[in-house]
Amino acid sequence: MDQPHPPENAETSIGGAPNGFIVEIPTLKSLFIEMCFGETVLGTGTAFLVSNNRESHCALVTNRHNLTGRHQETGKCLSNTGGVPDNIVIHFHKNNDFIGEWLPVRLPLYRSDGSPYWFEHSKLEENADVVALNLSWGGDVRKVPYYLETELDRFGIAIGPAEPVSVIGFPFGYSSTARFPIWATGFLAQELSLITPENPTFLVDCRTRQGQSGSPVLAYRVGNYRKIDGDKLSSVLSPTPIWEFLGIYSGRLNSESDIGRVWHASAVADVLAVATADALRREQKAEGHV
C-alpha cells in the first residue's frame, strides 16, 4: 500500500473561529443560485466555478435547463407560474477573512438582441445540459473554482460501480447552515469507461431532488482509495481527504427513481473552453488586435 504525495494545495478545509466556519474546500465551491423573472424568483439551483488552473480563465457552470427555465428534453416550463428566467442571482462568498458571508450578484441572462449570455457545448450545443457564463470579476467576491487540470480536484482516483459519490448542492433550496450546501451521497451506477464523446454522461444512484441541478459531483475519500497512475492501479492510504471532480448533476431520469444523470467532467471542460475562447476574443478586440 502506497503513501501518497500531497496534491497541489494540500489544504482540505478552510476557515475557523473567530474567522468563520471550518468547512471542507468542496463545500465552498457549490454556489446557491436563484433563477428570476425580474424580481420574481422562479426557482433555485446550484452552480460552481471552473478553471483549468490557477492562472487560467474562470467561468461559472450550471445546467442549461436552470437558465432556460424549461425541461431539457420536453421543453416544458419548469415554473408553475409559467414564467422563464431573464436573470440569475448568484450567491458568492465575500472576499474577506470571514468564511460564512455571501454577496448576492444579479446578472442578466440575455443581451438586448435576445441572444443568451451563456455558452453551450461546442458539438452537442443545446443538447448538452451544461453551460458556462463569463463574469466580470471584482475584488469583492471569493473565487473558489474546481481546477480541471490540477491534482487538487482531479487526483486520479479510480472509481467503479457501487462506489460512493457525492452531489453537493441545495435540494429544494435548503442549505446545511446559512448558504452552505448539503452533501447528498449515493453510488456510481455504471462504469465510467462507458462514457463516449457523443454521450458524455454517466448515471448515479442518489436520493436527489430539485434544486440540486447544477451540483458538482465528487468522489470524496478519507483513508484508503485506489489511484490510477498511468496504466498502473495502486491502493493508497491518505492521512487527509482526497477528492475527484467527476462532473455536473442534471437531474433524475424519472421522478419515481433515484437514478440520475451526470454530465462528465469532459463536457464541463468543453463549455469552459468555449467560454474561454469568447473571453479571449473580446479581450483582443478591446485591445484593438482584431
Locate each region found by the language model:
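A conserved glycine-rich beta-strand in the N-terminal activation segment of trypsin-fold
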Residues: T40-A59, I259
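N-terminal targeting leaders that route proteins to membranes or the secretory/organellar pathways
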Residues: M1-N19
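C-terminal subregion of chymotrypsin/trypsin-like serine protease catalytic domains
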Residues: P6-P7, V23-P26, A219-V290
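Long protein-protein interaction modules used by eukaryotic assembly/scaffold proteins
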Residues: G20-I25, V50
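Structural detector for hydrophobic anchor residues on beta-strands
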Residues: G43-G45, L60, A184, F245-L246
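Residue-level recognition of beta-strand microenvironments
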Residues: V50-N52, E191, Y220, G251
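Serine endopeptidase catalytic core focused on the charge-relay Asp
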Residues: L28-L31, G43-T44, K76, N80-N199, ...
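Short beta->alpha transition motifs characteristic of CBS
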Residues: N63-N66, G169, G247-N254
